[in-house]
Amino acid sequence: MSTQSLYKVPSEIAANALVNDEQYKKMYQESIVNPEGFWREHGNRIDWIKPFTKVKKTSFDDHNLFIKWFYDGTLNASANCLDRHLENNADKLAIIWEGDDAKDQRTLTYGQLHTQVCKFANALRSQGVRRGDVVTIYMPMVPEAAVAMLACARIGAIHSVVFGGFSPDSIASRVIDGNSKVVITADEGVRAGRIIPLKANIDEALSHPDVNCVEKVIVMKRTGGDINWVEGRDIWWDSLMDTASEHCIAEEMGAEDPLFLLYTSGSTGNPKGVLHTTGGYMVYAAMTHEYVFDYKENEVYWCTADVGWITGHSYMVYGPLANGATVLIHEGVPNYPSPARLGEMVDRHKVNILYTAPTLIRALMAEGKEQFAGFDGSSLRIMGSVGEPINPEAWRWYNDVIGHEKCPIVDTWWQTETGGILISPLPGATDTKPGSATRPFFGVQPALVDNMGNIVDGASEGNLVILDSWPGQMRTVFGDHDRFVLTYFKTFRGMYFTGDGAKRDEDGYYWITGRVDDVINVSGHRLGTAEVESALVAHEFVAEAAVVGYPHDIKGQGIYAYVTLTKGSVETEELRQELRQWVRKEIGALATPDLIQWAGGLPKTRSGKIMRRFLRKIAANEVSNLGDSSTLADPAVIDTLIETRLNRSE
């Protein structure tokens, strides 16, 4: 890697950073050689009701798998985000909220947030929610979403947040899997000037014949729009809060008691409920937030992620609030009503740390830097990227136009399953290279293996695995532990398989190359190809479908569908649009195929297995070197697909 593409740590950052390069190397070495001692020390960064004495009991053996951290200690996640700050910082701003319309502004101090959470925790109890119950949250990006999460944590209920862009069918599958007794939603959401019918989506989801677990739906009034009302089931948020007590003692939870479920795409088509527990997750979310963003007291921190994704959980709610940060929450999207919105919000709220996604950076880049002519940006100190690998062009644009070449960029790699950041630069310690996630966080042991599971050393490429546990790791797939073992620990024995490929350069820096399984990454959000295929095949005119990702200028990966129609069906543009709307309704807008290519046949082996590598290459317009097609039952299919491909370069 040439020195021209190496960005040195700015001297003013290095002088005041939490750790420099020498300290990073020393701490990292200690965390690997003596994990017990390292995490014993750092486990005490949060408050424990009963202090832990046992630190780590873990095994990645697929026949005898166990993951336990701080496992004889007790604590409460809500108390760690709120109560611990009240003595000295009750009047400090916890949340600054800006609505879709910039005129809508609200703030909550730590004292006010504590009161709201205690009241809503009591409200949940009044509706029959008990410790260990699953509560589904389907909310817009409003402070009440964080209040609902923290209230669940306060009483030991398990929250399951569903992204507001998901369809009724997706909501229903998550409600059924979690066996939720209570759903929390709003009348409507507002996003980029559009009204999102949240309550109507919940009503449709709960009308699903297999949903019979939900007893109550709590509705927050966001817009005041007309909504359907089910007497005896539906209840207004405000009416519960009006009568709820402000006092609620935090439930004493075991470190390994569940904190939340979050569903992520699986390659089998059924979303999997990733289960995170309380102690290790809180330690890891708080520690990574402080070290990766070099967080300093009294800084304003803005993570643009939706609360429905793991980034919103770890780096908008639990991590920052455990550290006593002031968090900016934005209801809309940072490029509405114009691309200048992001810069306006940074300047308006004097944001010091910005954490956003490559897909947004690319969208802003496409609009041109003149959109930021009036942007000051002097408050910004650290910038982060999350959700997918950031391409070097977007990295440089982010650095130059938003960061004014003075803010270190932390390109973070992690997953829903990991609970927190695993590979990332540290602002005062790591010289950066555009497009590289660089080096592992403390306690994280990445490795590259070939397809046989042999570890490859030095500068090389392979499957990215992690060799030992870290505190933020998921513990199981809810209700399906066998699937957890099979998905993550059977492919490469004794290792956690990330599902991603990576390269390691001569400096030991990691470069994530993308998914190696059948999951695609659209705008930083993971979608299982099987899920989209299942939705397409459910249409009466579709006989077969194969879905792959392809390079997309804005979204990173777009969705490319090859569709074989039933006999007698006619390939028309109208049907193409109908199928796009069909998938949108079945799964949600995120899953809408960008391109649908009619396919008379698909490339299959003689055993009937679809050879996706050919489909990926054709979708990516890489048709000159497709590789060996001798195993195909009908190699001529390939020629036809190449001839009729849609993603041609001009």
Swiss-Prot record:
Catalytic activity reported: acetate + ATP + CoA = acetyl-CoA + AMP + diphosphate
Keyword tRNA processing: no
Binding site for CoA: R191, A192, G193, R194, T311, N335, S523, R584
PROSITE patterns: AMP_BINDING (PS00455)
Enzyme Commission number(s): 6.2.1.1
Residues where N6-acetyllysine is found: K609
Pfam families per the UniProt record, alphabetical: ACAS_N, AMP-binding, AMP-binding_C
UniProt keyword Repeat present: no
Positions with a binding annotation for ATP: G387, E388, P389, D411, T412, W413, W414, Q415, T416, D500, R515, R526
Cellular component terms per the entry's GO annotation: cytosol
One Gene Ontology term from the biological process aspect of the record: acetyl-CoA biosynthetic process from acetate
Residues engaged in binding Mg(2+): V537, H539, V542
InterPro entries: Ac_CoA_lig, ACAS_N, AMP-bd_C, AMP-bd_C_sf, AMP-binding_CS, AMP-dep_synth/lig_dom, ANL_N_sf
Signal peptide bounds: none
Record note on modification: Acetylated. Deacetylation by the SIR2-homolog deacetylase activates the enzyme.
Record GO terms (molecular function): acetate-CoA ligase activity; AMP binding; ATP binding; metal ion binding
Chain's role: Catalyzes the conversion of acetate into acetyl-CoA (AcCoA), an essential intermediate at the junction of anabolic and catabolic pathways. AcsA undergoes a two-step reaction. In the first half reaction, AcsA combines acetate with ATP to form acetyl-adenylate (AcAMP) intermediate. In the second half reaction, it can then transfer the acetyl group from AcAMP to the sulfhydryl group of CoA, forming the product AcCoA.
HAMAP family: Ac_CoA_synth
Family affiliation: Belongs to the ATP-dependent AMP-binding enzyme family.
The protein's name: Acetyl-coenzyme A synthetase
Organism whose genome encodes this protein: Shewanella halifaxensis (strain HAW-EB4)
